[in-house]
């Protein structure tokens, strides 16, 4: 601790000598700004010129405008610089801040504060303990994610298997029902009696008794020549007989009429 204070005291004395140098007083404003550029603050931050910074307050010295700790260690949070000073030392912190760019000094100061707090909390591992814990947490989350993905795939596979089994059951049920319908139709066809014969065709209406039905016309057959000759001869003979031999009925009637006329008185 005493060595660090001595080193910081030497640095402070060097700054005082530079400020007391006459050449420093005769420089232009641009040169002064060039010297102060080493302690420039990020945009939106002003130098602490009212109260001493946490570093100067802890080291019990006057805080100059060019103090490298003033923009990054507020006097309202002295515990931050106390942790950094206890772990790294004031001179080492000032060197670290001056080695980085002006736009990154704020992040460097916050990183030093974080590392110092973790080192004080865990002297063995420090930041490595937090990094290992975060790595284990990431691994556990990855394993949980893998488990969830496996469950999702398993549920999807079960759903696909269920849909396939339902389709197979539906197809088998349809096939069984069609086969049973065919068997039932075959059994009913075997057990049922044969169908009745078709009804007979309707007969023509029967004629009255006074009008006997004409006999069916026999098929017309041509007579043979001998029959034609005999029939013609018989017809000729019958005609001859009728010419020379009048029928007896007519002659009898004629004789009766003559006998009855014998009684008629002529010329009365």
From Swiss-Prot:
A Pfam family of this chain: LOB
Entry-linked PROSITE patterns: LOB
One GO process term, biological-process aspect: positive regulation of DNA-templated transcription
CC terms in the record's Gene Ontology section: nucleus
Residues covered by region (Disordered): 191-268
Compositionally biased tracts (Pro residues): 192-205, 212-222
Polar residues: bias regions: 250-268
Positions with biased composition (Low complexity): 223-243
Protein family according to the UniProt entry: Belongs to the LOB domain-containing protein family.
Name by which UniProt lists this protein: LOB domain-containing protein 13
Protein species of origin: Arabidopsis thaliana
Gene behind this protein: LBD13
């Amino acid at each position: 601790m005493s060595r660090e204070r001595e080193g910081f005291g030497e640095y402070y004395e060097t700054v005082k000598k530079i400020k007391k140098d006459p050449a420093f007083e005769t420089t232009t404003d641009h040169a002064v700004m060039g010297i102060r550029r080493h302690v420039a603050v990020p945009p939106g931050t002003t130098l602490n010129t009212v109260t001493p910074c946490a570093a100067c307050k802890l080291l019990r010295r006057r805080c100059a405008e060019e103090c490298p700790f003033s923009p990054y260690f507020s006097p309202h949070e002295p515990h931050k610089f106390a942790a950094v000073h206890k772990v790294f030392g004031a001179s080492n912190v000032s060197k670290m801040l001056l080695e980085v760019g002006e736009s990154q000094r704020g992040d460097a100061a916050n990183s030093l504060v974080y590392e110092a707090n973790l080192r004080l909390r865990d002297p063995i591992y420090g930041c490595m303990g937090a990094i290992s814990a975060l790595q284990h947490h990431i691994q556990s989350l990855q394993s949980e994610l893998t488990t969830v993905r496996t469950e999702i795939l398993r549920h999807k596979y079960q759903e696909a298997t269920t849909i396939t089994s339902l389709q197979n059951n539906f197809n088998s049920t349809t096939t069984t029902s069609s086969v049973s319908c065919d068997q039932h139709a075959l059994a009913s066809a075997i057990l049922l009696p044969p169908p009745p014969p078709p009804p007979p065709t309707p007969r023509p209406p029967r004629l009255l008794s006074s009008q006997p039905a004409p006999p069916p016309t026999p098929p017309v057959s041509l007579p043979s020549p001998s029959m034609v000759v005999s029939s013609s001869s018989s017809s000729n003979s019958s005609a001859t007989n009728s010419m020379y031999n009048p029928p007896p009925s007519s002659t009898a009637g004629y004789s009766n009429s003559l006998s009855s006329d014998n009684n008629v008185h002529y010329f009365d």
